[in-house]
Amino acid sequence: MADKPTKGLADVVAASTALSDIDGHAGRLFYRGYDIHDLAGRTTFEETAHLLQRGRFPTRGQLADYGAELVRGRALGALAETNIPEIAEKQAPMEALRTLVSLASGDDPDKDSNSPEANLRKAARLTAQQPVLVARYHAARTGAEIPDPDPELSIAANFLLQITGRTPSDHEVEVFDACLVLHADHTMNASTFAARVCAA
């Protein structure tokens, strides 16, 4: 006798990952085994990004090195930078970010390497550049003048500085940093899942 067919997507495994685990029934989210409730508001986005990208929480020294890598990684190459005004005129925000990330990859010094070390460097640069790309896109759409990224500020603080044009309060940074931690990973975007279903 054949197995009873599964209705809908119940018990269907769409992907395997060591990064995050979602228990929808219990309303729980884990990053590399850590409950999101233990991370959000207690760790920084930089610590969480290190955990997701490198598999472990950073020591103080590793966090300082990773933070310096992120600061260096904020610099945009000419390919993305020069195209922001035109993209801001023609594309909606998510389309623009997709396009700008693709353009930024064209200037990436590790673009022709797929080694694990190069991929970690690319992940750090992508993490650092996306907030800058979004802020520059926003400025191009609104005509706002924005400050350059401040190497002394976190990703959350820098993004708020560049979007608003003013130094954010500690409370604003804490709230936005927690938001970044909460949204750092959720296994697979709905659009990616839909594309995989269509391709199957």
What kind of feature is each model-predicted range?
Residues M1-A200:
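Hydrophobic alpha-helical bundle cores within soluble ligand-binding/oligomerization subdomains
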